[in-house]
């Protein structure tokens, strides 16, 4: 179990300054990867091929209730006071979240004037660790606070690494409605999740020693599968690829989406993503500890005739009352379901009045709109509301400026740039731009980058 926690720590810690949404990318028509956020989007081009391993790279993560500046700011306050403020200022609904995606390959082609088919594969890492408020306070305060109860229910985490093979179809029903769906086959490389943790720790006055410590109704379970090794030296880089393509821990899911056009200038879109399940049945190691335990510590007796291993006796007594069970039973894990919705109004001088050739269904130079996003997490639903402004500059550059209110802040400014030089599409997207000069002040940020080759042809 310790090895699992070490692995998750090294995966999560480098990214805890990033945020969890893709609102700059959503409904960005020029970019093929928008099809992964809404399979029913009005994608306007005829063919695309993603540059292998570079078509879509995104890193998103965040920490609610905490940023590095809160602790390390040079403001004259004691760092001990600042750490104390953080420890007692956060609660069990605060979380550390990271999501990373790497587009391994992606292809899209227009089957007819009304149908577009796309398929590909990407790798995804998603993890959420909730702040175990009582446990952190226990370690900070020590065990001498009499009769103060500390709950272990706040110890919750979920993490997974998986490969996703997908294929989707976008169908234009009529001039006003476009719908789409995407089938996903999951291959889990690693999964770890806690389940129904409960129990209470408190300290009372002892009879033999000063204090007596009590662990009551303790029941903790962590389920793991996939790339978990008893010895880290057993891991080989080839294991990552082998697991991804072996489908030893398979799953299935789907996305649905639509775009409804009320007029030439007014659009409404929506999508639901990752309605899916993974069956974890290979390399399953689940650990459960259950029981009650009371101790007044170790009472030392000095006798020249008896040599006693007090520590061994203590550990044996502990494990006899709190036995660790290792299970290999398969279990199911569910993908975090996501919902997107948007309203967009286009205006300004149309493309064709300046003699530019436009391949898009929306010929106007400017767009404004509103987006909503939510994702289902183990304890709380997370939300994001975004205002955006889009602007085209000629036929080669498109920009998108966003302002978001989310679970992390009320001042998230994002910017997206998408260029097209001949068939080459390059895009760069980022948010939390207000904190570029001092990223330590940000609770969240995200970065996305990709290169695609886009081609068009006319259908009769």
Where are these regions (language model features)?
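Bacterial Sec-dependent N-terminal signal peptides
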Residues: 1-23, 455, 460
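Generic low-polarity alpha-helical segments
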Residues: 3-8, 49-51, 175, 181, ...
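The feature marks either
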Residues: 14, 123, 140
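Proline-rich low-complexity regions
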Residues: 14, 39, 336-338
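N-terminal, post-signal peptide beta-strand-biased segments of exported outer-membrane/organellar beta-barrel
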Residues: 19-125, 129
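Outer-membrane beta-barrel porins/channels
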Residues: 22-27, 34, 135-460
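Short, solvent-exposed beta-strand-terminating loops
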Residues: 51-74, 121-137, 188-200, 277-289
């Amino acid at each position: 179990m310790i090895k699992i926690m070490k692995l998750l720590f090294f995966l999560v810690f480098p990214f805890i300054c990033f945020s969890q949404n893709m609102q700059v990318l959503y409904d960005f028509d020029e970019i093929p990867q928008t099809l992964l956020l809404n399979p029913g989007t009005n994608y306007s081009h005829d063919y695309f091929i993603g540059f292998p391993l570079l078509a879509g790279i995104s890193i998103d993560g965040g920490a609610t209730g905490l940023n590095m500046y809160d602790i390390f700011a040079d403001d004259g306050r004691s760092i001990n006071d600042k750490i104390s403020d953080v420890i007692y200022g956060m609660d069990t609904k605060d979380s550390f979240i990271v999501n990373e995606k790497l587009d391994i390959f992606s292809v899209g082609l227009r089957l007819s004037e009304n149908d577009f088919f796309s398929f590909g594969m990407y790798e995804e890492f998603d993890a959420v660790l909730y702040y175990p408020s009582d446990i952190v306070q226990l370690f900070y305060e020590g065990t001498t606070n009499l009769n103060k109860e500390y709950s272990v229910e706040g110890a919750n985490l979920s993490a997974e690494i998986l490969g996703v093979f997908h294929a989707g179809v976008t169908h234009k029903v009529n001039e006003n409605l476009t719908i789409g769906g995407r089938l996903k086959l999951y291959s889990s490389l690693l999964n770890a999740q806690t389940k129904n943790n409960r129990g209470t720790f408190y300290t009372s006055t002892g009879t033999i020693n000063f204090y007596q410590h009590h662990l009551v109704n303790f029941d903790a379970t962590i389920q793991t599968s996939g790339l978990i090794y008893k010895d880290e030296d057993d891991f080989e880089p080839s294991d990552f690829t082998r697991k991804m393509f072996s489908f030893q821990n398979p799953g299935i899911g789907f996305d649905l989406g639509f775009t409804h056009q009320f007029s030439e200038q007014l659009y409404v879109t929506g999508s639901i993503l990752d309605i899916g399940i993974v069956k974890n049945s290979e390399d399953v190691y689940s650990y459960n500890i259950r029981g009650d335990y009371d101790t007044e510590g170790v009472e030392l007796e000095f006798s020249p005739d008896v040599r006693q291993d007090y520590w061994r006796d203590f550990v044996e007594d502990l494990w006899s009352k709190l036995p660790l069970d290792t299970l290999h039973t398969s279990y199911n894990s569910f993908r975090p379901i996501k919902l997107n919705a948007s309203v967009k109004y286009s205006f300004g001088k149309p493309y064709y009045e300046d003699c530019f050739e436009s391949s898009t269904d929306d010929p106007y130079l400017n767009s404004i709109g509103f987006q909503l996003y939510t994702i289902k997490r183990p304890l709380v639903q997370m939300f994001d509301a975004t205002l955006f402004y889009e602007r085209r500059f000629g036929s080669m550059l498109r920009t998108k400026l966003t302002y978001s209110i989310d679970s992390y802040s009320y001042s998230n400014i994002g910017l997206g740039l998408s260029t097209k030089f001949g068939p080459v599409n390059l895009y760069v997207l980022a948010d939390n731009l207000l904190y570029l000069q001092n990223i330590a002040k940000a609770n969240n940020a995200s970065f996305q980058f990709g290169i695609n080759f886009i081609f068009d042809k006319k259908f009769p």
